[in-house]
Design a protein with these regions (language model features):
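A short acidic, Gly/Pro-enriched loop at the edge of an enzyme's catalytic core
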Residues: 113-124
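A short glycine-rich, Lys/Arg-flanked "PGG" loop and its adjoining helix->strand segment in the class I
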Residues: 138-150
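Class I SAM-dependent methyltransferase SAM/SAH-binding core
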Residues: 61-63, 67-114
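C-terminal alpha-helical "lid/dimerization" subdomain adjacent to the S-adenosyl-L-methionine
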Residues: 32, 159-229
Length: 248
C-alpha cells in the first residue's frame, strides 16, 4: 500500500509529465499527421487488424491516445473508439485530427492509471508509446485488465527507454526534430524517476500481465512491420508489441 508521501510524490510527477506532453503536443501532432497521411498508416492498420477479434464493431479504448493516431485508424476500421490522455494539449490535437480526417470518437482527459469506466466495458485496450512514461505502469495494467471483458485483447506497443538518454543530436535526426534542450532535459529527468525505467521490457510486462490473468504473446521488435515510410526516421530503440488476451 502506498504511503501519503509516496502518493504526493507520484501526483507531483504526474503534473510534470502532463506539463511536458502539453508542451510537446503541437509538434508531436504534426508527426502523427504525417503518419496518417503517409504509407505507415496502412501498415499500422493491417498490423493491428491481424491481432483483433473478428467481431465488429469492437468497443476499443485507446489509452494515451496522444494526437489520436490509433483513434483515426480504428474508427476507419469501423470500431467504436474512446481515446483518453492526461494531456489536455494532446486531447485538443486529437480533436483537430479527428475533424481533419473526418472521424468521430469519444475523447476524454483521463489518467491511464485511474480509469472512469465500469468493469469489463471494453473488447480491446490499445496503447502506443505510453507505458514508458507512467509513474505506475503496474497500476495501469491492473486498470486495463479491469475494464476488459473476459476474452478481450490488450495490445501495447512501446519501447524500453530505461537506459536511453535522449539528446538534441538524436532529436535533430529523427521525426521529433525541434524539441528544445529544456524539454529534453526534463524528459530525461522524468524518465529516470520512473520505476518502469528500471525494468527490462517487454519481459517485465509479459510476466506481470500473466500474473494479472492474461495469456501473453509478444514480439521484441515490430518496427520493420509498421515503419516503412523513409521520410519518417524514428529512434533505434526496438519497438516491441504485446498481445495479451484476458483469460481470468
Amino acid at each position: 500500500m502506498k504511503t501519503q508521501e509516496m502518493l504526493q510524490k507520484e501526483e507531483a510527477l504526474e503534473r510534470r509529465i502532463e506539463s511536458y506532453w502539453d508542451a510537446r503536443s503541437p509538434k508531436f501532432s504534426a508527426v502523427r499527421r504525417r503518419e496518417l497521411e503517409g504509407s505507415d498508416a496502412a501498415r499500422w492498420q493491417k498490423f493491428i487488424a491481424s491481432h483483433l477479434p473478428e467481431k465488429k464493431p469492437l468497443r476499443v479504448l485507446d489509452v494515451g491516445t496522444g494526437a489520436g493516431f490509433f483513434v483515426v485508424l480504428l474508427t476507419r476500421m469501423g470500431h467504436e473508439v474512446t481515446g483518453i490522455d492526461m494531456s489536455a494539449g494532446m486531447i485538443d490535437e486529437a480533436q483537430k485530427n479527428l475533424a481533419a480526417f473526418g472521424c468521430r470518437a469519444d475523447l476524454r482527459k483521463m489518467n491511464a492509471q485511474q480509469l472512469d469506466f465500469s468493469d469489463e466495458f471494453f473488447d480491446v485496450v490499445i496503447s502506443r508509446n505510453l507505458t514508458w512514461t507512467l509513474p505506475d505502469a503496474m497500476e495501469a495494467y491492473r486498470e486495463w485488465h479491469r475494464v476488459l471483458r473476459a476474452g478481450g485483447m490488450l495490445l501495447n506497443f512501446d519501447s524500453d527507454y530505461g537506459e536511453t538518454t535522449f539528446s538534441a543530436a538524436d532529436a535533430r535526426d529523427s521525426v521529433h526534430t525541434g524539441i528544445g534542450e529544456a524539454l529534453l532535459i526534463e524528459c530525461n529527468k522524468i524518465k529516470d524517476e520512473l520505476r518502469v525505467s528500471t525494468h527490462r521490457r517487454p519481459l517485465w510486462d509479459a510476466d506481470l500481465l500473466e500474473k494479472l490473468g492474461f495469456s501473453v504473446q509478444y514480439d521484441a521488435d515490430i518496427a520493420s512491420l509498421v515503419h516503412g515510410d523513409e521520410s519518417l526516421r524514428y529512434d533505434d530503440v526496438p519497438l516491441f508489441g504485446i498481445y495479451a488476451k484476458k483469460v481470468k
